[in-house]
Regions:
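Acidic, negatively charged sequence signal
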Residues: 48, 72, 80-83
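Short, charge/polar-rich alpha-helical segments
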Residues: 2-24
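Short, Lys/Glu-rich amphipathic helical modules
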Residues: 29-56
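Generic short beta-strand
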Residues: 100-101, 108
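Terminus-proximal functional modules
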Residues: 17, 21-24, 28, 32-35, ...
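Acidic, low-complexity cytosolic segments
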Residues: 80-95, 106-226
Length: 226
């Protein structure tokens, strides 16, 4: 089983090398996430193990990427070495992932909804149908974003078996979109056998984006994360 503590942080080098080493660290963690997906797909770990380990890796990546973008990229090493339970990303005026819903491409019905996905089905169904029609006309069409009347944004992420619909509080950044696209790819790979079955049991699926939604949907109370 993948152990999150075995993710090595490079030894400090020259300041000008900090950003490059940070990117190398992120690449190493991405490799570990891919192995984690395969372990769940092969039945080697359970859902709880998958969710907690995937969440820890994703938070490492987001923290390092944020600090690399700041004025002193060398700070990322110290952040990675801190406890995962007490590490908090700096508060910024960024979009929050309010909720996500996964739809079965075969039936057009929702498989699971996470977070506070307060969007009426009467609105989602025609939008999803329109999106699929447009995607069918464009080979390998990618994700689409649309702004709602209340200022929130809906993001449609296509997959082989499912379509992920993500609800953001504001317009998401390119990095946020890349994150949910990767999470959706991992969702389909981890649950490949279950999604190919005639009947899909949502309680047997692993959801890489579960923690992504929960952490951003919960109000700030200053307490430690569980």
């Amino acid at each position: 089983m993948v152990n999150p503590s075995d993710t090595p942080a490079p030894d400090p080098g020259h300041p000008q090398d900090s950003a490059r080493e940070g990117q190398e660290f992120i690449a190493q963690v991405h490799q570990k996430m891919s192995r984690l997906v395969q372990e769940f797909a092969n039945g080697a770990i359970n859902r709880t193990q998958f969710h907690r380990l995937y969440d820890r890796y994703q938070r490492q990546i987001m923290t390092v990427a944020q600090l690399i973008a700041e004025s002193d990229p060398s700070m990322w090493r110290d952040a990675v070495m801190e406890s995962e339970d007490t590490l908090h990303l700096k508060k910024r005026l960024t979009a929050k992932a309010v909720g996500m819903s996964v739809y079965d491409n075969r039936s057009g019905m929702p498989i699971e909804t996470l977070g506070e996905f307060a969007v009426e089905a009467d609105l989602i169904v025609p939008m999803l149908s329109s999106y699929r029609s447009a995607a069918a006309e464009i080979f390998r069409a990618g994700m689409r974003n649309t702004e709602m009347e209340n200022g929130q944004w809906l993001c449609f992420v296509p997959g082989k078996h499912t379509t992920l619909i993500a609800l953001f509080s504001l317009e998401p950044s390119d990095n946020q979109l890349a994150t949910i696209e990767r999470m959706h790819q991992d969702f389909e790979e981890a649950n490949r056998a279950a999604l190919e079955a005639e009947h899909i049991d949502p309680d047997r699926l692993a959801y890489p984006f579960y923690a992504f939604v929960q952490h951003r949907a919960r109000p700030d109370n200053g307490g430690d994360e569980k």
